[in-house]
């Protein structure tokens, strides 16, 4: 997992590349946490019954740790941007009857999470 901070004191990004899951299945979970406060997203990921929650949960914790340790954010955080992009897919062949074969595509995806501080009221 890669992390970067392009804009100082504004946002923290965390990337996970080549996760061995379909982007469509990961988007189902990312739509649930987008725009929510960190604590609420943490609880949602802990209890949602999808396999895609685990890598997103790890990535969210990594981004929060970077916000605390590298950027010294002390206020509440929220998920400002959460996106999933398709990555390369590897092809495997499944051999069938009568000399035929079918192509099986093993899909991967890239996940990006951006955390920001909640604006002061």
From Swiss-Prot:
Main location: plastid
Protein location: Plastid, Chloroplast
BP terms from Gene Ontology: translation
MF terms in GO: rRNA binding; structural constituent of ribosome
Pfam families: Ribosomal_L22
SUPFAM superfamilies referenced in this protein's UniProt entry, alphabetically: Ribosomal protein L22
Keywords, in A-Z order: Chloroplast, Plastid, Ribonucleoprotein, Ribosomal protein, RNA-binding, rRNA-binding
Function: This protein binds specifically to 23S rRNA. The globular domain of the protein is located near the polypeptide exit tunnel on the outside of the subunit, while an extended beta-hairpin is found that lines the wall of the exit tunnel in the center of the 70S ribosome.
Subunit note: Part of the 50S ribosomal subunit.
Protein name from the UniProt record: Large ribosomal subunit protein uL22c
Organism: Welwitschia mirabilis
Gene: rpl22
């Amino acid at each position: 997992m890669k992390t970067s901070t392009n804009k100082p004191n504004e946002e923290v990004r965390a990337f996970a590349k080549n996760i061995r899951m379909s982007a469509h299945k990961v988007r189902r979970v990312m739509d649930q946490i987008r725009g929510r406060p960190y604590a609420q997203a943490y609880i949602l990921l802990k209890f949602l019954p999808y396999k895609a929650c685990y890598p997103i949960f790890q990535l969210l914790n990594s981004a929060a740790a970077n916000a605390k340790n590298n950027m010294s954010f002390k206020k509440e955080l929220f998920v400002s941007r959460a996106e999933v992009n398709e990555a390369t897919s590897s092809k495997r062949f499944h051999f069938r009857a009568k000399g035929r074969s079918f192509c099986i595509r093993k899909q991967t995806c890239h996940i990006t999470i951006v955390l920001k501080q909640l604006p002061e009221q």
